[in-house]
Amino acid sequence: MSTTFCSSVSMQATSLAATTRISFQKPGLVSRTNLSFNLRRSIPTRLSVSCAAKPETVEKVSKIVKKQLSLKDDQKVVAETKFADLGADSLDTVEIVMGLEEEFDIEMAEEKAQKIATVEEAAELIEELVQAKK
């Protein structure tokens, strides 16, 4: 049994507004009085759970990214580093994903692989896929 510790949980709420019209009519009268008011209530729209990847996974991903992008050894690549900030284009990102798949013996679905923008996101997806293989 494995335990996952999450680093953050956030919930975003949006307001839903609705306008309601009520008409009152007194018996025997032809005219109407209209009232209009807004009902507001918060409805949670999205619950986001972000679990930090293991430091060793982040380190491996960082090394692969540096290798695939031919970065210097002293180039800092941390969990929050975006591939685009390192000069990676879409082809570079495909090569990074291929390197990660080979290193971790996994296969990433194309739609998930396209959403990876940072080292942390790659590490989290890798851990998810490795866990699913077990």
From Swiss-Prot:
It is found in: Plastid, Chloroplast. 4'-phosphopantetheine is transferred from CoA to a specific serine of apo-ACP by acpS. This modification is essential for activity because fatty acids are bound in thioester linkage to the sulfhydryl of the prosthetic group. GO terms for molecular function: acyl carrier activity; phosphopantetheine binding. Its main location: plastid. The keyword Lipid biosynthesis applies. The modification O-(pantetheine 4'-phosphoryl)serine is found at S90. It holds the Pfam family PP-binding. Pathway: Lipid metabolism; fatty acid biosynthesis. GO terms for cellular component: chloroplast. Residues 55-130 form the Carrier domain. It comes from the Eukaryota. Residues 1-51 form a transit peptide. Keywords: Chloroplast, Fatty acid biosynthesis, Fatty acid metabolism, Lipid biosynthesis, Lipid metabolism, Phosphopantetheine, Phosphoprotein, Plastid, Transit peptide. Seed. Belongs to the acyl carrier protein (ACP) family. In rape seeds ACP is coded by two multigene families. There are probably a total of 35 genes. Carrier of the growing fatty acid chain in fatty acid biosynthesis. PANTHER family: ACYL CARRIER PROTEIN (PTHR46153), ACYL CARRIER PROTEIN 1, CHLOROPLASTIC (PTHR46153:SF9). This is Acyl carrier protein, chloroplastic. It comes from Brassica napus (Rape).
